[in-house]
């Protein structure tokens, strides 16, 4: 399995852990605000091979305690469970980032004990989900299933929404609060414009707006926080 990149140290990507972040290529979404756009279609021959990653992790035993696996969409990769098993065998805890579009794979990974923390991106309220994911006619049933699974599961998790001025409004967050009511934790993340973003001309909401949106959600999800300001 090819690994498209690795951030050798992060204190942010895995809450409460000293971790590295592993980037996998390929994604079924085309979110206009995606900051990892180069990973969407990266060639398999790019990056490092799996053995190189595992050798790095062996050397970092005792220095790192967690591995965050992100993309792209990691659950697109059929070889992912085998990679997670090998990382687990080295004694690491694993955080898995996902867009929730593959609930069967998500459930299998969690039930096998191959993910200790799941971070699921919630793009928007259902009415604007397809637009925000960049996929016309997107079927939402798999997304609903993944949300329902995490709300019931014993695995640690978070939901998070990257807030973009052109894509989100008060109604978005009122609906999100209803949908995700009772969630363990929820983050409103501030969009960061970068040159690699898929769609030019998008803007970050103001800090005041982010706080307003967080407060709209709080009655249904008390553990709501803002990231990126």
Spans of features found by a protein language model:
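Glycine-rich, highly charged phosphate/nucleotide-binding loops
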Residues: 46-56
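Canonical Radical SAM [4Fe-4S] cluster-binding loop centered on the CxxxCxxC motif
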Residues: 14-48
